[in-house]
Structure formats: structure tokens, C-alpha cells
Amino acid sequence: MCIRDRPYTELPPGVMHPRRIMHGVVEGVRDYGNRMGIPTVNGAIYFDDRYVGNPLVFCGNVGMLPKEKSFKEPQPNDLIVAVGGRTGRDGIHGATFSSAELTDKSEVESGGAVQIGNAITEKMVMDILLQARDEGLYSAVTDCGAGGFSSAVGEMGEELGAEVWLDKAPLKYEGLSYTEIWISEAQERMVFAVPEKHWSRFEELCSSESVEAVVIGKFVPTGNLELKYHEHSVANLSMKFLHDGRPPVVRQAIFEPKSDGDARVEVIEGDCEKFTSDLLKILGSLNVASKHWVIHQYDYEVQGGSVLKPLVGVENDGPGDACLLYTSPSPRDLSTSRMPSSA
């Protein structure tokens, strides 16, 4: 998290205080990550003046899956199945907004770009994804994050073609246009390519977990992306044009790193008590001070694989150099003689 902390009196007009943003981000990661059952084991918060108008949040996940399941390729006549959360007006233009220039009016004009998340729904979708994967019930899957159905179906059908029936998509409420249905983004909604012979079992599996699954089209070997709304064709583009039709944007930039100067440190001899105030200033710096208040909000023990944890030491109150996760926790693999050292 890259944030700037400064007094309210020094903020530019229309800028929300960075401290409020920081607490909101911390709470968002906590509430979503903990409910999803994903261990949050590492992170950093960096404070700098340059982030006063545009704080940055970088997130990353590391996962593992069987090698034979690491490739995805929709097959002709595979059903396009929407699974998870319903479609609403929230999350429209979220991907483009995140890269846009922010102004004092952005909060009002672009409020709809923010997704209304539901961690519980996504957790159930994740459980379905893993069970259906192990049973070999789908040939490809993509999330509806940036771009919604438009990016998910467009990406999956690039080498094949797709026909989408937008009026079949489950909606949160009535009144959405087919354009809004097509581009609305949601992290807890995913698109699966399901062979027709597996649809009955796939639907049964989703029902067992109370997860909504609806067929909204099929992948067809036409090389085109066709969108239909109540039997009317509202868009028809070739996949080649969709992915390669626009000339690539080429930009040139020159990076000139600043010189750190002489890195040598001058040692000053004298009474150590004279340096107490300087030491307290360093320890009080937001970039140096303890981040335990953030770390303790995150569940880094879930799944039972955390061997080296974020905080170490006798009192478990000092930051460690790194975290270590055991990839396949099993009681048979644990050495009881070494367990106390990992407690």
C-alpha cells in the first residue's frame, strides 16, 4: 500500500484524507480475505508525499494447481455458463477508471465503477471451481473482473468464436441495458466453458452449494463474437478484429535513476544519550514503526500451512524476513519433534 499521511490542513481541495483511505483498504483486505479463507501472510505499507492524490494498492496471490489442469481451451459447442453473483450497474468501467486521471469530481461521477463485492458468494464459487475441476466438468474458466462478460467471453473465445445471449444473464434488478450487462464487472462472478455432456452434473454441483449457474451462450467455430438480446443481434465482430484490429500503442520512455551519492556513513563518537531524540524520530517514522496493528487483523493461519509467520521472536511481535507456507499440509508429514519451533 503506497499512501501519504499528512495533516488535514495540508490536503489539496477534494482529496480524501490518506489515513481514511488506508484504514478502508486494510479493512477491505481483512473482511474479504478472511472470509475467503486465504492466508494473508505478507505485505508492506509505504508512505510518501507523491501518493497524496493517488494512493496505490498492489495485491498479489500465489496459488498451485495440478499440472494437467494448467491449460484451458474451450471446445466447439461448449456452453458459456455464468456462475456466482448476479449482474448489476456496479463495477461498470472499473478497469478504465482505475487508470484515469482523478479530479475532485471523480467520487461523484465515477462512483458506479466501484464493485459491490460479496466474499461469501465468491468463496462458494471457489469451492465449486475446485470440485468441478477435479471432476473434469469444464474446459476453461475466466473471472469477470475487469470488463465483465466482455473480457471473459472475448478472451476465452479468441481462437474459436462465441454466441452470447445477454437476456439470459441473471440480474440483480430490472432495467439494465444489454451494454450494461455486457461490461458490468464483479469478482464473484465467473464464466465457465462447460461441455454439454457435463452440464447436468455441473448444474447439480452448483445447486448443492447454493451457487447460481446459468447458460448464457455457447462457443461456436465461427471466428466471430455475436451478442444477442431477446433474439436480436446487437453486436457481431470478428475475433481477429477484436483482439488485433487496433494498431498497437508504442511509447518510448527514458528512465534516469537518481544517484544515491556517497553511501558511506560517518561515525560520530560521543555520549549515546545525545542520540536518543534522533533514534525516537526514526522509530516514530511511519515507514519504520511497527505494522502489527495491520498484521493482526489478517488471518495468516487459515488452511494450516503457515510455518514461518509474519511476526516472529519470543513474543511474536517482531517482523520476520519472509513467510513460509507448507503447500500440502498433512498430519503424516509433520514431525512432532519440530512442531514447537513452528508454534
Q: Model-derived features: where do they sit?
A:
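Glycine/proline-enriched, intrinsically flexible loops and inter-domain linkers
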Residues: 4-328, 332
